[in-house]
């Protein structure tokens, strides 16, 4: 098998920046794909991704995919439940496979973690396994190195590989340039950082 050359799906959030930093440290990072799908937090999240790429001299590929639904829909606990774009990772991984092939990469790396699996079917081991089987038809592997980690463990890994936590964005419900502190993403991040 040839040496790993990864394309990371980079949102600018803690998880994706952590996997990008992991691949960079291993000298296996070929490029990052930054996707604007109309997410309400794009104004703050995407600059974090772009800045990370610039800081580390990593090729940043950009895609605009507004058809994914932007703000998405709520699941779970009514209006207070997590916001999701149904099948977002399915679409992003598909884009990633295409971009990987065009840009000479043989793997797509995603930042899914164990805490994501309850609310997001496309962050589960079974999904990543199936996506990998499909992508392998094109000679591209799908990797999710954080899949067995809780958000707290991701923070530990982020610190271990040198991620500047303050340079990442996790809020899905910003009311300005500061995180809301109350959305699911903010709560998970705060809990993980509290230890």
Task: Please identify what each model-predicted range represents.
Residues 1-162:
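ATP-dependent adenylation/nucleotidyltransferase module used to activate substrates
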Residues 193-195:
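Short Cys/His-rich "knuckle" micro-motifs
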Residues 94, 167-191:
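Local cysteine-cluster metal-coordination motifs and their immediate loop/turn environment
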């Amino acid at each position: 098998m040839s040496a790993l050359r990864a394309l990371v799906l980079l949102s600018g959030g803690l998880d994706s920046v952590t996997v990008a930093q992991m691949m960079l440290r291993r000298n296996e990072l070929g490029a990052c794909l930054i996707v604007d799908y109309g997410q309400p937090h794009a104004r703050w999240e995407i600059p974090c991704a772009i800045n990370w790429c610039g800081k580390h001299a990593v090729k940043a590929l950009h895609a605009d995919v507004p058809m994914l639904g932007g703000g998405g829909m709520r699941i779970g606990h009514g209006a207070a439940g997590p916001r999701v774009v149904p099948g977002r990772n399915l679409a992003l991984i598909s884009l990633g496979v295409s971009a990987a092939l065009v840009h000479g990469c043989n793997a797509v790396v995603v930042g899914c973690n164990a805490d994501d699996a309850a609310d997001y079917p496309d962050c589960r081991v079974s999904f990543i396994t199936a996506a990998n089987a499909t992508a392998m038809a094109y000679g591209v592997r799908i990797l999710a190195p954080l899949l067995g980690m809780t958000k707290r463990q991701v923070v530990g890994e982020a610190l271990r590989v040198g991620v500047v936590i303050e340079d990442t964005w996790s809020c899905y419900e910003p009311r300005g340039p500061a995180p809301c502190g109350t959305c699911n993403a903010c709560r998970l991040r705060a809990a993980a950082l509290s230890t």
